[in-house]
A protein has these predicted regions:
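Amphipathic alpha-helical dimerization/coiled-coil segments
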Residues: 1-20, 34-37, 93-115
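N-terminal helix-turn-helix DNA-binding core of bacterial DNA-binding proteins
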Residues: 18-60, 81-90
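Short, hydrophobic-biased segments on the C-terminal half of alpha helices
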Residues: 65-66
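Glycine-centered, phosphate/nucleic-acid-interacting loop/turn motifs that mediate DNA/RNA or nucleotide
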Residues: 72
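Short beta-strand "wing" residues that participate in macromolecule-binding interfaces
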Residues: 76
């Protein structure tokens, strides 16, 4: 069996586990959690800064940032610095609350597993 065939069931199990434990499925993904975490400790970050911090591709970061924006967890402002396009993100109050809930839930799960 090829490695990608083994990975699909693992991803499906992870999604089912997130749903079963009540974790916020919007946040429960590596890049989206990284975006929210970075924005929680920075007032604002540009697309290029986030891309570098998260080691993400342009397309990957765009898709995940859009998903967070649709959920109301971040805002996105597009503009220009001189003639260069610039995209800047900020976490919203709802995003900060959702991240806090998510982290509390994860801490409780970890505590339960550790006993």
């Amino acid at each position: 069996m090829e490695s990608h065939e083994k990975e699909a069931p693992r991803v499906a199990r992870s999604r089912r586990a997130a749903a079963a434990t009540g974790l916020d499925r919007v946040i429960h993904e590596r890049v989206r959690l990284g975006i929210l975490s970075a924005l929680a400790v920075n007032d604002r970050l540009g697309f290029t800064e986030l891309k570098g911090l998260l080691d993400a591709t342009d397309g990957n970061l765009s898709v995940h940032a859009r998903r967070l924006e649709e959920a109301g967890y971040i805002t996105c402002e597009k503009g220009y610095e001189g003639r260069v396009p610039h995209t800047e993100y900020r976490i919203t109050r709802d995003g900060r609350r959702a991240l806090d809930r998510y982290l509390s839930h994860m801490e409780a799960l970890i505590g339960a597993v550790k006993g």
